[in-house]
Amino acid sequence: GGDSLSIVLNRKLDKFLKDHGATVQVREGYGTTECVTASCLTPKDFYKEGSIGIPYPDTYYKIVKVGTTEEVAYNQEGEICLCGPSVMLGYCNNEKETADTLKKHPDGYTWLHTGDLGKMDEDGFIYFSQRIKRMIITSGYNVYPSQVENIIDAHEAVSMSCVIGVKDPYKVQKVKAFVVLKAGF
């Protein structure tokens, strides 16, 4: 599986490319194995920071409350769902996994539940948060490692970071960060 590019790292890459005379830019996208290929890409001339882009033609996205088929409002986080001709028909010889992943919604269409958290804005841009399985639950709160990593990575002394959950007998999990400092710090 993949993960999103942090806003800070994206800025660093774009600056590096520009400083070295490149005329290209980093363009984030999104795709799943179950959807054959990428299904969403950041338009070349319309970038929204933190977005993974807009859906390809004939590919539809919606965000639902986790564990349901209920759509959430714009800019509210939920599970990313996809629908369209490039979505798989099912997993080979695995009816249970197929039933857990492909679900018929009240709109009559079958939607792929990606297992990813994200949101959609009013312009149809998609924002990936992280894998649902990567979420850390500590003292009853949902903590998203990618959000903590973005904050840590924004510090001038930090080269990169990785945040994980570690078991805790009282809090269920505790947040643990691994940090690589820049040279000289």
Write out the residue ranges for each language-model feature.
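Active-site glycine/GP-rich loop and adjacent strand/helix microenvironment
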Residues: S39-L41, G53, V72-Q76, L89-N93
